[in-house]
C-alpha cells in the first residue's frame, strides 16, 4: 500500500509528483483514466457535472475523444485536460491543495522539437485555482519533468513481467536513482 503525504486539511504536506499521459483518446494518471473530449461553455452545464470551471468558463470533459493534433499546444484543450487530470489524481489522494511536480511524456520523435514548447504551455501559470466536478482545487505547480513516453510509466513499477520487459531493457533503470528528465 502506497503512503501519500497528507494532512487533515486536504493539503499535501510537501511536494507531490503527479504523472499525466496526454493521449488523444484518453488522459491517464496513476489511478484514473478519462476520455479527452472537451466542450467549452460560457454558462454552467445543466446536465453534466463532469466539468472544469476555469477563468469563468466551463469545460465539459470526457464525452468524446480529441482528433489528432500534430502540436498539442495549439489550443487550450490539453491545458484544461491537464487541470482535470490533476484534480482526478488529487481527489484520489484525498487532496484539494498541493505543491505539485508534474511529470509528463512526449513521443520520442517530438522530444527535441516540442519539449520546450510543451514545458512553456504546461507551466504558463504556476498558481492554479480551478474547480472540477464542483470541487475547488488549488495547485502550486512547482516543477515539470518531461520524459520520453513510456519512461515515466515504467519507472514507478517494481517488476513488470512479460512484454514490458522490452522497455525496461532499453532504458535500464535501477533504484534508488531515477532517469533524468529532458530539459
Task: Give residue spans per PLM region.
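Short, intrinsically disordered, charge-balanced linker/junction segments flanking boundaries
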Residues: 164-174
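Nucleotide/phosphate-binding catalytic cleft detector across ATP-hydrolyzing
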Residues: 1-166, 183
Amino acid at each position: 500500500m502506497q503512503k501519500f503525504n497528507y494532512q487533515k486539511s486536504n493539503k499535501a504536506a510537501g511536494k507531490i509528483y503527479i504523472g499525466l499521459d496526454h493521449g488523444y483518446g484518453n488522459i491517464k494518471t496513476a489511478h484514473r483514466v478519462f476520455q479527452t473530449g472537451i466542450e467549452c461553455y460560457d454558462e454552467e452545464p445543466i446536465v453534466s457535472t463532469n466539468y472544469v470551471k476555469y477563468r469563468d468558463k466551463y469545460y465539459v470533459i470526457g464525452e468524446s475523444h480529441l482528433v489528432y493534433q500534430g502540436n498539442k499546444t495549439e489550443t487550450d484543450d490539453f491545458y484544461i485536460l491537464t487541470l482535470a487530470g490533476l484534480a482526478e489524481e488529487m481527489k484520489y489522494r484525498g487532496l484539494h491543495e498541493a505543491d505539485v511536480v508534474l511529470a509528463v511524456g512526449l513521443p520520442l520523435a517530438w522530444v527535441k522539437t516540442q519539449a520546450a514548447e510543451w514545458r512553456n504551455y504546461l507551466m504558463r501559470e504556476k498558481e492554479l485555482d480551478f474547480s472540477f466536478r464542483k470541487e475547488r482545487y488549488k495547485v502550486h505547480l512547482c516543477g515539470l519533468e518531461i520524459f520520453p513516453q513510456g519512461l515515466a510509466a515504467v519507472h514507478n513499477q517494481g517488476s513488470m513481467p512479460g512484454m514490458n520487459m522490452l522497455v525496461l531493457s532499453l532504458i535500464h533503470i535501477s533504484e534508488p536513482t531515477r532517469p533524468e528528465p529532458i530539459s
